[in-house]
Amino acid sequence: MHYPEPLSKLIDSFMKLPGIGPKTAARLAFHVLAMKEDTVLEFAKALVDVKRHIHYCTICGHITDTDPCYICKDERRDRTTICVVQDPKDVIAMERMKEYNGLYHVLHGAISPMEGIGPEDIKIAELLTRLQDETVQEVILATDPNIEGEATAMYISRLLKPTGIKVTRIAHGLPVGGDLEYADEVTLSKALEGRREL
C-alpha cells in the first residue's frame, strides 16, 4: 500500500517498537491522524521528554530522572542486601509486591553466547565494584528463569563465592522460560521467600 510520505514515516517509526508489525503500525498511525492536534503534540512531547530526562542510575542502573534514583537515595532501605535483576522492568515488578526492602543492581541483559552477549557486555563488573564499596551481606540473583538467566546467575554466583557474601537464587514459583516482569505479586513474593543459597 502506498501512503503519503509523512504517514509512511510514522508507520515505519511505530514498527521500530517491539511487537508492532505493519498492520498494527498502520492502525496506530491512522489513530494518531484522527487525534486532535493538541493531543498529538502532548504525545510527541512525552516521547521527547522521556528520551531527554530519563536515564540510568549511576549506582544501580535502574531508570530515573534523578541521580541517584529514589531507591538508592532511600536511607530506610536495607543496604545489606542487593537483588540482581536483568532489566529495569524487573525492579518495577519487584517493587510492586512491596515486600523487598533492599537495594537493586540492574544488569541490562543476560549472558547469551548464542546472541554474542558475554559477561563483559552486561553490568557485572559494576556489581563487583559496588560490592567492594558497600556492606552487602547477601546478593539475591533474580534473573529470569530461562537458559540465559540461569547461566548469568551461575556465572555471578561463581564470581562471588570467594567474597564470603551469601548468594541466593529466587525460587522457581516463576515459570521456566518466563520473564520476571510478567509475574504477579504473589508469585514474585513466594519466589523471593523461597530463594535458595547457591
Swiss-Prot record:
Residue ranges covered by zinc fingers (C4-type): 57-72
Source organism (scientific name): Geobacillus kaustophilus (strain HTA426)
Domain Toprim stretches: 80-175
GO-annotated molecular function: DNA binding; zinc ion binding
Protein name, entry field: Recombination protein RecR
Record-stated family: Belongs to the RecR family.
InterPro entries in alphabetical order: DNA_Rcmb_RecR, Rcmb_RecR, Rcmb_RecR_Znf, TOPRIM_dom, TOPRIM_RecR
Transmembrane domains' residue ranges: none
GO annotation, biological process: DNA recombination; DNA repair
Record key words, sorted: DNA damage, DNA recombination, DNA repair, Metal-binding, Zinc, Zinc-finger
Entry annotated with the keyword DNA damage: yes
Pfam family, one: RecR_ZnF
Purpose of the protein: May play a role in DNA repair. It seems to be involved in an RecBC-independent recombinational process of DNA repair. It may act with RecF and RecO.
